[in-house]
Swiss-Prot record:
This protein's UniProt keywords: Adaptive immunity, Cell membrane, Disulfide bond, Glycoprotein, Immunity, Immunoglobulin domain, Membrane, Receptor, Signal, T cell receptor
Name of the protein described by the UniProt record: T cell receptor alpha variable 23/delta variable 6
Domain Ig-like: 30-121
Endpoints of the signal sequence: 1-21
UniProt cross-references to InterPro entries, sorted A to Z: Ig-like_dom, Ig-like_dom_sf, Ig-like_fold, Ig_V-set, TCR_variable_domain
Source species: Homo sapiens
Main location group: membrane
GO biological process: adaptive immune response
Assembly: Alpha-beta TR is a heterodimer composed of an alpha and beta chain; disulfide-linked. The alpha-beta TR is associated with the transmembrane signaling CD3 coreceptor proteins to form the TR-CD3 (TcR or TCR). The assembly of alpha-beta TR heterodimers with CD3 occurs in the endoplasmic reticulum where a single alpha-beta TR heterodimer associates with one CD3D-CD3E heterodimer, one CD3G-CD3E heterodimer and one CD247 homodimer forming a stable octameric structure. CD3D-CD3E and CD3G-CD3E heterodimers preferentially associate with TR alpha and TR beta chains, respectively.
Sugar-bearing residue positions: N95
GO MF term (any one): peptide antigen binding
């Protein structure tokens, strides 16, 4: 029984190290750059957050919203064949030639206070 438990622990440890190594490689390459780092907007204002990418093979560009103590949730996403997509007060704009996409929140509300981040894959 001890040998089986020891083997299970070793497999789990190796998987965690592999995942950790993968994350380091991705962070070293910095797949996307988001700006600004923080943003203060008055109620009713427009929030604009930009994201730039380098890899032209990417074909999916999501924005996520994360409230304190919660996991990230997909807010809106776009593909390169569409220049703009709207969902309620949220708009995502895509500029393929500039290799960037932007998130716009119209009529910002106090309930919109959260962490927003972009991704590309």
């Amino acid at each position: 029984m001890d040998k089986i438990l020891g083997a299970s622990f070793l497999v789990l440890w190796l998987q965690l190290c592999w995942v950790s190594g993968q994350q380091k490689e991705k962070s070293d390459q910095q797949q996307v750059k988001q700006s600004p780092q923080s943003l203060i907007v008055q109620k009713g204002g427009i929030s604009i957050i930009n994201c730039a990418y380098e890899n032209t093979a990417f074909d999916y560009f999501p924005w996520y919203q994360q409230f304190p103590g919660k996991g990230p949730a997909l807010l809106i996403a776009i593909r390169p064949d569409v220049s703009e997509k709207k969902e309620g007060r949220f708009t995502i704009s895509f500029n393929k030639s500039a290799k960037q996409f932007s998130s716009h929140i119209m009529d910002s509300q106090p309930g919109d206070s959260a962490t927003y981040f972009c991704a590309a894959s």
